[in-house]
Amino acid sequence: MNGGHIQLIIGPMFSGKSTELIRRVRRYQIAQYKCVTIKYSNDNRYGTGLWTHDKNNFEALEATKLCDVLESITDFSVIGIDEGQFFPDIVEFCERMANEGKIVIVAALDGTFQRKPFNNILNLIPLSEMVVKLTAVCMKCFKEASFSKRLGEETEIEIIGGNDMYQSVCRKCYVGS
């Protein structure tokens, strides 16, 4: 075994996926691994770099396709990817990097605001050595929340936003509204 593997962090919005991604990458940095993070370039809510909803910032490469950064990451042994659901080549990229001996950590939504799967992320599950599903707090009743609910009427899947556009909700509050 070459040590390469895939860690997948999934859950609804506001569940701490990006925070957990940053925590894991920092652990590897402390252990003297050469690390890089990649964020989806169309996500520019807070500025450059990888940002959490509570405004923590971490340096990151930006791309819309992961194959575009292949040449920039050859020297790194740990690759963190945020908003993995938006990368069309996430499955092939992660499998290739893990097979080359790299540790790949992906933070991603597992479902849309309509509770439909992000198929590229579901296709990563059988290829991953570790899968963690986080929950958030329901922004309506304050119980455990497993779903993201869009506040507006837009129907497009890729609309990037924060708590101005989305809420994390439990099953009861998702179905009841």
Swiss-Prot record:
Coiled coil: none annotated. Pfam families: TK (PF00265). The active site is at E83 (proton acceptor). GO terms for molecular function: ATP binding; metal ion binding; thymidine kinase activity. PROSITE patterns: TK_CELLULAR_TYPE. Its EC number is 2.7.1.21. Zn(2+) binds at C138, C141, C170, C173. It comes from the Viruses. It catalyses: thymidine + ATP = dTMP + ADP + H(+). One of its GO terms (biological process) is thymidine metabolic process. InterPro entries: P-loop_NTPase, Thymidine_kinase, Thymidine_kinase_CS. Substrate binds at F113, I157, E158, I159, I160, G161. ATP binds at G11, P12, M13, F14, S15, G16, K17, S18. Homotetramer. Two molecules of substrate bind to each enzyme tetramer. PANTHER family: THYMIDINE KINASE, THYMIDINE KINASE, CYTOSOLIC. Phosphorylates thymidine and thymidine analogs, such as azidothymidine (AZT). Part of the salvage pathway for pyrimidine deoxyribonucleotide synthesis. Belongs to the thymidine kinase family. This is Thymidine kinase. It comes from Vaccinia virus (strain Ankara). The lineage of its organism: Viruses, Varidnaviria, Bamfordvirae, Nucleocytoviricota, Pokkesviricetes. The gene is OPG101.
